[in-house]
Amino acid sequence: MGKSAVLELAEDLISRPSVTPEDAGCQELMIARLKAVGFRVTRLPANGVENFWAERGGAGPRLCFAGHTDVVPSGPLAEWQNDPFQPIIRDGMLYGRGAADMKGSLAAMVVAAERFVALHPAHSGRLAFLITSDEEGIATHGTRHVVDWLREHGETIDWCVVGEPSSEKVLGDVIKNGRRGSLNGRLTVHGIQGHVAYPDKADNPIHRAFRPLADLVDQSWDAGNDFFPPTRLQFSNIHAGTGANNVIPGQLQADFNFRFSTESTPESLQAGVHKILDASAMRYTIDWQLSGPPFFTAPGPLVAATQKALQAVEQRVAQLSTGGGTSDGRFIAQLGGQVVELGPVNATIHKINECVAVADLEHLAQIYMEIMVHLLETANGR
């Protein structure tokens, strides 16, 4: 028995070393397949990043499948059981960098579209793809760039399925129907450098920062809601000092991150931080960077179609979740449509010996096609 179309495409994509922001020819491979079944393709490169928008159909609601061709670095090659860019199958698992995050999903999307078009060549609505090579990196010139282009052209997306590896233990046990926002801050506490033997001639920023930093950690920012856990602040880096044990440092720098719910806004969190720090006696500055606001898709047509697809293929009812890190869904949601994430099991993503179950690839293609059928055909009375 030969390999399935999904497996063959997944292997071809994995074999291309597209370490972020490189694409290594992955998108041209996808574009050729999509053009062959009638998709109109617009390439949207930006600052060394490869992006494309592909669409089929002329009018009606738009269903988009989104994903990224870039992968994280492989890590130490000696620790891999195989070359990370020479995919192999072992014990029913496909191994290679990007197998789960997210070249397996990309292969499933493309094959699902091919099969859908073969069965429904005159389908209602519009079927689209939004693909980038800048998701694992700074994510500035990728999906965000394509979304800006769509907005400039007055285009919207009604429904979007992002192929991120959402599953926890088995395929389709979790659907991500939202993500928390992410806000970064770099706090600099300004002191006066001096000799530790003469503290009255210096101003120690470490001492100044102790209580305010503890107050930030202890602060309750919000209580969350039915769909999001409470907003949390975490410090990731703190640095002060020259390395010498007889020098009071002149400044302290602390990096922190908020993962925040829809109960908070970047503005409310910034105001809360400044209120706590202003109550202290220290001199400070903060540089803020918003990675993305939270987004949430309430149960509706897209969630229902995704659940029905999972029931049809996997006989499974998925848990809806907003947990985990950020994704490109945060940019797509700004166009006003419904967004979910559904993809393979995420147990090995970004790890040595990343892998995906071969059987799950075929099932995922079936699930994606069922979503297409439900939203573009069944829901429209076709």
Swiss-Prot record:
It comes from the Bacteria. The active site is at D70, E135 (proton acceptor). Its EC number is 3.5.1.18. CDD domains: M20_DapE_proteobac (cd03891). One of its GO terms (molecular function) is acetylornithine deacetylase activity. Disulfide bonds: none annotated. GO terms for biological process: diaminopimelate biosynthetic process; L-arginine biosynthetic process; lysine biosynthetic process via diaminopimelate. Keywords: Amino-acid biosynthesis, Cobalt, Diaminopimelate biosynthesis, Hydrolase, Lysine biosynthesis, Metal-binding, Zinc. Zn(2+) 1 binds at H68, D101, E164. Binds 2 Zn(2+) or Co(2+) ions per subunit. It is an enzyme of class 3 (hydrolase). Belongs to the peptidase M20A family. DapE subfamily. Catalyzes the hydrolysis of N-succinyl-L,L-diaminopimelic acid (SDAP), forming succinate and LL-2,6-diaminopimelate (DAP), an intermediate involved in the bacterial biosynthesis of lysine and meso-diaminopimelic acid, an essential component of bacterial cell walls. Homodimer. PANTHER family: ACETYLORNITHINE DEACETYLASE, N-ACETYL-L-CITRULLINE DEACETYLASE. This is Succinyl-diaminopimelate desuccinylase. It comes from Acidithiobacillus ferrooxidans (strain ATCC 23270 / DSM 14882 / CIP 104768 / NCIMB 8455).
